[in-house]
Amino acid sequence: DVHSTKLYLDEPVDLILHEQIGDFLFDEAMVPNVCDLRDRLLKPGGLILPSQFEFYCEPMTMHDDRREPYIWELDDVYGFDFSSMERSRPYDAEYNGLVSCDLGVVKHFLGEAEPVIKVDLNTVTESSLPLKISFSRKVVNPGILDGLVVFMKAKVDDDLELSSSPLDSKRAPHWGFRILRLDQVDTELGDDLEVTLRVKDWADPETWRWTCGVWGGGDLNE
């Protein structure tokens, strides 16, 4: 076995067929690895399959029986109030995120899902990926804002699409999705959600930082 960056051939190829797709699209270094092969080994006009991807980061609510509040959100457990523990809350991404492939975790998205990044491996470069994404969602499905769910879609051709969406019953089962947790806030129909995701390294979700502002029915969360 050899890593793709160490692969050398006598002549260029017509096709790059890969499965470098991470659970959250970028976490298996798909972009730098495939771009390296493309620039070194693919003939002009050659094909990359799959080459078209969408990255999603959607505000969502969880099923009640799957919701696990932060300990400082528990203010009446048999008379005990743990809210003071917020002063000691950890801010590392590992504590504030979780990974699952269970279709029973996410109840619904709060807004209409739209891709926040589209990737075309025929043209993308690693340096062209944004390190800050800001976008808004209008609440059309009210509920508790539990966090942001990160997933991807891969468009193989006009007839075949692969998804890691937590709401897709036909999703590729071996791919997970990532939940970026937030303090719980109740949202109402018509509320505006303002999301910002900052990234140092797309391949390392522990470098991601996120906020979500709720306007019209809540407070700023981070």
Task: Give the positions of each predicted feature.
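Class I SAM-binding transferase module
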Residues: 2-198, 202-222
